[in-house]
Amino acid sequence: MTNPRPCLRQLWILTGICLALISGCGRPSPDTLRFGLQTMPVTLDPRYATDAASSRIDRLLYERLVDFNDHFQAVPSLAAWRELTPRHYRFHLKGGSHRFHNGAPLTSADVKATFESVLDARTASPLRASVAHITRIETPAADTVDFYIDTPDPLFPGKLDIGILPADLIRRNHPFNRRPVGSGPFAFVAWPSEDRLRIKRVGDGQVIEFDQVPNPTVRVLKLLRGEIDMLQNDLPFELVKYLEHHGGIRVQRNKGTNFTYLGFNLHDPVVGTLAVRRAIAHALNRAAITKFVFAGSARTANAILPPSHWAGDPGLKPYDYDPDKARALLASAGFDAAHPARITYKTSSDPFRVRLATIIQSQLDKVGFDVDIRSYDWGTFYGDIKSGRFQMYSLSWVGIKTPDILRTAFYSTSVPPNGANRGRFQNATVDRLIDAADSTADARVEAADYREVQRILLDQLPYVPLWYEDHVYAARSDIAGYTMAEDGNYDGLINVHRVNSPGH
């Protein structure tokens, strides 16, 4: 399907140009480690973080009550918990003094203020829907928080993975989005420009600088030049192969669970038609894309939850690649060669995402669609998606741990800003099953309800599932200590270091 040579030729053509452009740039201080990003975070306020970069960097700046293990199960982080009744959970902050980076102690009052802020409709947090069943929060002691919920929910602790903010700063409407104050392993230093963000490791003072380099070829060239020390993901496989065979660079690969999909505006007269969405599903040769474009570094997906998830469904039947069936479905919806189904397809301006969009466009056009690709810078693109200004788009969900994502993305009332149901999907059976799953105390019944939700979603196609992408990390040979996570977070920065730096 694709030839790797054009990308490599592009690399060599750009090498001369880019080396000339950056030759005047000084190498970074050895005291700073630079991490190359495709896109910068939208916000550093954990109450609003829904994009990948924001979520991953917020994990470094803030502590949260709970985290998740490799089996997608909630485990204690800042606090351990007990279920006193099916509607009452008590959390104890773990031993030791917890302090925010401004020196203030972290107590149960801060936990209470954080979640009450998320629950406050005036905050307009997109995370509100996941904790909306909290009826009250009490703080019987400085290290104790009681959560009361209106219905039993055995997954409730896992929904509290939101970074904790200082209560006094919440009251003063502190701009956490640009000047975060947390208690995590890293503290905020500066955001001097839109393409540069610095944080500092609390334990040893190591500074990490995130540098936005949207073009993947330029990002690789900066890595080779030493202008950045490491990067993760958002590279075409040809560049990954190139780095793997380049001296002085270390490359790690890891299976991932980040879910890429096509999303639709279901109020649109074209893609709002089920037959059209099913035609799209049958027109896409996902197996060929994962084999040739990703070089096997992605797996086809049938649902937002991977089959390995405890609520995932490995028995979901995929939409086979069947161009003839796609044409027949289009005909049944009233489209033909004289009257093609016209779709505007929005994507980010990242070259690899544009390349994928072009391949999808070609496959759809072959069966009778007329697809117009519109690519935008990340801020404009993501703003359009959140605001519902789209007909069709492609995006990825990252860091999914709990099946509560099904409520966030598909429940009828989870339309932004109350959630992430951006396509305005409505299905009474899905709503009922999600409510039933949330209210049962039987984990087996809960898993069965969520699997049925996923079967309905695959049938109704508010999303067309595409694939789970693997993770790739590349660093200069003097960088060590970084371990990749299955969800692609940046927690490896907690231990990363330059091997010739003092103390290593």
Locate the predicted segments by residue.
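Extracytoplasmic/peripheral linker and loop segments enriched in polar/acidic and small residues
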Residues: 26, 370-381, 408-477, 504
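Append "and occasionally in soluble cytosolic enzymes with long acidic Gly/Pro-rich linkers
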Residues: 272-362, 426, 432-433, 452, ...
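Gly/Pro-rich hinge or "lid" segments in bacterial periplasmic/extracellular proteins
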Residues: 152-209, 215-218, 324, 328, ...
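Long beta-strand-rich cores associated with HINT superfamily self-processing modules
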Residues: 202, 473-504
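Ligand-site clamp/hinge motif
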Residues: 195-241, 370
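Surface-exposed binding/hinge segments that line
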Residues: 28, 92, 126-169
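N-terminal lobe/hinge region of extracytoplasmic solute-binding protein
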Residues: 37-86, 116, 181-182
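Aromatic- and charge-enriched surface segment that lines or borders ligand/interaction sites
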Residues: 80-124, 146, 219-222, 270
